[in-house]
């Protein structure tokens, strides 16, 4: 949940709340003069208007072509909630967000994702090329501790026959996983800290346990729960396609998709103050317009 995103959501809500209220009222009164709703709205529109009108417009365009269900949004929401654990509610509250407003942003992100996926080549030829270097997801559990001495202590207890899940609950500082035996969600290449990923993929059999691994978070001891099993292209095709599509969700590809969708939607900006809002999508600018007059 990036700080810029959170700030943007807050500003968007404030901007359009002011628009809905209409002009005329004062938001601040001083002996030196008052700040009116109109002044505040105009200032916020000037600073944030282009960014927000882009999103609102693309919500209309993409929402007309692609389906994002409440279940899709809830799933992504719960992923964030799990990621931030006990701090999630505090992050929302400190940012002036509600679950509803955050879910609204998530829905937009998912619309962009679906549009990008729909505009991505997933022919067998493309997927077979990707399959040559593709690795399946794996599932591991881990015990995270702060220092090497504690990691070695846990490692010795495992060698002495202690159960991994019991030690995760007792020692792990990862509050999101410790009560579940330390088990993480399935992941593939490029999703974890490089040192963690290398050590995890080096475990070939279920039940294999790594030596302590140092990352920016501390020291991990990793247990393989479900190793990677690559079979044949036809059998793995569904997973390969999902992995390939995810790999294509780059900023560049999403921008290309939005440009295409914008062009197909016949967009006309009626507000002269926002005439440059879509210059990155149609190649126009106010200077171009002025020079053509």
From Swiss-Prot:
Lipid group attachment sites (N-palmitoyl cysteine): 21
Catalytic activity: [protein]-peptidylproline (omega=180) = [protein]-peptidylproline (omega=0)
Signal peptide start-end: 1-20
Domain PpiC as annotated: residue spans: 135-226
S-diacylglycerol cysteine lipid sites: 21
A GO BP entry: protein folding
GO molecular function, one term: peptidyl-prolyl cis-trans isomerase activity
Annotated Gene3D superfamilies: 3.10.50.40, Porin chaperone SurA, peptide-binding domain (1.10.4030.10)
Subcellular location(s) per record: Cell membrane
Membrane topology, as annotated: Lipid-anchor
Entry's family note: Belongs to the PrsA family.
Protein's UniProt name: Foldase protein PrsA 2
Gene, per the UniProt record: prsA2
């Amino acid at each position: 949940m990036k700080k810029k995103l959170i700030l943007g959501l807050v500003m968007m809500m404030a901007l359009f709340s002011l628009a809905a209220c209409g002009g005329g009222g004062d938001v601040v009164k001083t002996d030196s003069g008052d700040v009116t709703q109109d002044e505040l709205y105009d200032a916020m529109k000037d600073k944030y208007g282009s960014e927000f009108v882009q999103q609102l417009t693309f919500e209309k365009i993409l929402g007309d072509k692609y389906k994002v269900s409440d279940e899709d949004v809830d799933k992504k929401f719960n992923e964030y909630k799990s990621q931030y654990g006990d701090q999630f509610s505090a992050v929302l509250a400190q940012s002036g967000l509600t679950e509803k407003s955050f879910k609204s942003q998530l829905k937009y992100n998912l619309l962009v994702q679906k549009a990008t996926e729909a505009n991505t080549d997933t022919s067998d030829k493309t997927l077979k090329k990707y399959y040559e270097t593709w690795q399946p997801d794996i599932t591991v559990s881990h015990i995270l501790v702060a220092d090497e001495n504690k990691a070695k202590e846990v490692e010795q207890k495992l060698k002495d026959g202690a159960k991994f899940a019991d030690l995760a609950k007792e020692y792990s500082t990862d509050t999101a996983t410790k009560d579940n035996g330390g088990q993480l969600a399935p992941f593939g290449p490029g999703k974890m800290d490089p040192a963690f990923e290398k050590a995890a993929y080096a475990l070939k059999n279920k039940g294999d346990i790594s030596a302590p691994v140092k990352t920016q978070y501390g020291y991990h001891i990793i247990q393989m729960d479900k190793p990677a099993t690559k079979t044949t292209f036809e059998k793995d095709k569904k997973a390969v396609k999902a992995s390939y599509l995810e790999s294509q969700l780059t900023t560049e590809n999403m921008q290309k998709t939005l440009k295409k969708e914008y062009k197909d939607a016949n967009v006309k900006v009626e507000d002269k103050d926002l005439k440059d809002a879509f210059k990155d999508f149609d190649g126009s600018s106010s200077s171009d317009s002025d020079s053509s007059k």
